[in-house]
Amino acid sequence: MAVSDNTFSMSTMFNALPNPTETSGYIPPSGFAPRASATPLHAALFNLMTDGDGVSYFKEMISKSDKTELQRMASLLTSDSDYFMSIVTTKFGSRRVQKLLGKSDDVDAFFCAAILRRFLHITTDKYASYVTIRAMVVFDKVMKKALYERILYHALDLACDQHGCIALNDIITDADDPYYRDQLLELVVSNALRLSNDASGNFVVQHVLTLYDSRCIHNIAVNLYGQCIELSFKKYGSYIVEKLLEVEESMVVVVVELLGCDGDRLMRLARNEFGNFVVVKALRFTKEMRMDLFWGLVQKLMPFIHLLRRSHGNNIANILDTFRLRC
């Protein structure tokens, strides 16, 4: 049903909405079928929120709505969890719900309750996750605290989800509460190895490293010590090790592990499609910051220079050629 064909005028729709006080405490049981969504009123609102051609109509309706009307609209949108999910999991539904967030504390209270009821499902959805992200920016401190607690509880689930990891990264970046920000960072740090080996979780570790928090970087390096070489053989793990090499304190931890392994393993790493980038970066940054470690790597790699040629390690062989006469 196109918005232009909607038989419900703005005043008719809002007049038909229930009083907010009648629905604010309603929490449907798990798996509850959204029977209300079959009513003409719910169908009209669903169409308003999700129709790709209804952008201007939605903007007009919101601009002309007063606080009470917006509150009633929020009440109807969140009166049933399944109905709410059916809206926020669509591209336009998510965007329009985000537009409603921050209008007033009363409106936000309805959306906060709805997000908390289906927190994990919402925050791991491709589109709905942006509702949580937006909520963490515009909600008041009390509502943010409730969401922070839920985020901490589900943080690892979010980190290991393809959409949840993006949401978690944004939430960490925008976190304006020092206590909860530190709690989230500590959770990532303490689970660095597990997350580094996860297809989605490694992006969270990478993100925390790009915040350049010296304490976090050091602690991640310490927690990954002994596993850096193994991670370097993997596509995403190698990205994490490369980032650790960019800061001197964590770089030392990685290079000490490289120097401590047997030469054959270091050679295999240097020939690896992902590991060669780690070795090149180790040579580059040790040369800039720690010449003693740089020469240690050169001497350890030099006996294998002939094996590095015509492989992924050819770029390393070229670097070694420059210093061959000095060894």
From Swiss-Prot:
Pumilio repeat ranges, renumbered to this chain: 79-114, 115-149, 150-185, 186-222, 223-260, 261-295
Main location: cytoplasm
Gene3D superfamilies: Leucine-rich Repeat Variant (1.25.10.10)
Subcellular location field: Cytoplasm
Sorted UniProt keywords: Cytoplasm, Repeat, RNA-binding, Translation regulation
Signal peptide (from-to): none
A single GO cellular-component term on record: cytoplasm
Occurrences of domain PUM-HD (ranges): 1-324
GO BP term (any one): regulation of translation
Pfam family, one: PUF
GO molecular-function term, one example from the UniProt record: RNA binding
UniProt domain comment: The pumilio repeats mediate the association with RNA by packing together to form a right-handed superhelix that approximates a half donut. The number as well as the specific sequence of the repeats determine the specificity for target mRNAs.
Role: Sequence-specific RNA-binding protein that regulates translation and mRNA stability by binding the 3'-UTR of target mRNAs.
Protein name (Swiss-Prot/TrEMBL): Putative pumilio homolog 19
Gene: APUM19
